[in-house]
């Protein structure tokens, strides 16, 4: 699945940031080769379709959102990479983690050994980390370029974007953003360097 209009946005991103389509394709190909033969996309559908979902980012408001998450444990939690550490440190379990593997790798590996679905994104700058998918029990692959084999393109550029696009693609009844701050402050769980 590729969202309508994504290709033109992707070309703009390549141009604006100086990224390489060739490297994105190589990383996608590598990810595809490491994914399990049977990809259970229906597991994601069962968690999202016609249900409210929390999309959780690593913004500065995340610590204040934890009480809401603890109060509503049964609502599906789609967690952006950087927020994973905060979620598991507070005794919560992500249902889905969307990651390009630049967050806290210890937290990602720990979560990846559970039933959490790890949605791993391949791009030109993370090919050296793609092998981590072998440690994940339930893994789905995504790309920002043309999908191939078992690797999909649901849209989005950041982990947080991809969480929202994933929820939308699987027809969530309602998408509730937590820890997704649109200001200039970076949360303590976000990566330090910004592209």
What are the residue ranges of the model-derived segments?
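N-terminal donor/sugar-recognition subdomains of glycan-related enzymes
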Residues: 1-53, 63-65, 186-195
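Glycine-rich anion-binding loop/nest that anchors nucleotide
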Residues: 55-60, 159, 174-188
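Glycine-rich N-terminal segment of FAD-binding domains in flavoprotein oxidoreductases
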Residues: 56-61, 65-69, 76-88
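Acidic/Gly/His-enriched mid-domain segments of enzyme catalytic cores or analogous surface patches
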Residues: 73-76, 82-173
């Amino acid at each position: 699945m590729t969202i309508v209009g994504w290709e033109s946005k992707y070309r703009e991103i390549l141009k604006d940031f100086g990224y390489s389509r060739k490297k994105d394709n190589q990383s996608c190909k590598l990810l595809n080769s490491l994914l399990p033969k049977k990809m259970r996309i229906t597991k994601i559908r069962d968690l999202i379709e016609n249900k409210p979902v929390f999309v959780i980012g690593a913004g500065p408001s995340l610590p204040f959102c934890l009480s809401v998450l603890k109060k509503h444990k049964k609502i599906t939690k789609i967690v952006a990479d950087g927020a994973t550490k905060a979620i598991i440190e507070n005794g919560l379990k992500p249902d889905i983690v969307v990651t390009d593997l630049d967050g806290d790798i210890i937290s990602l590996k720990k979560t990846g050994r559970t039933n959490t679905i790890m949605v791993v994104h391949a791009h030109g700058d993370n090919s050296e980390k793609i092998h981590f998918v072998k440690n994940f029990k339930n893994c789905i692959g995504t790309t920002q370029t043309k999908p191939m084999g078992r690797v999909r393109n649901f849209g989005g550029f950041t982990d947080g974007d991809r969480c929202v696009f994933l929820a939308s693609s699987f027809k969530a009844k309602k998408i509730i953003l937590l820890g997704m701050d649109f200001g200039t402050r970076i949360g303590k769980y976000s990566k330090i360097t910004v592209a």
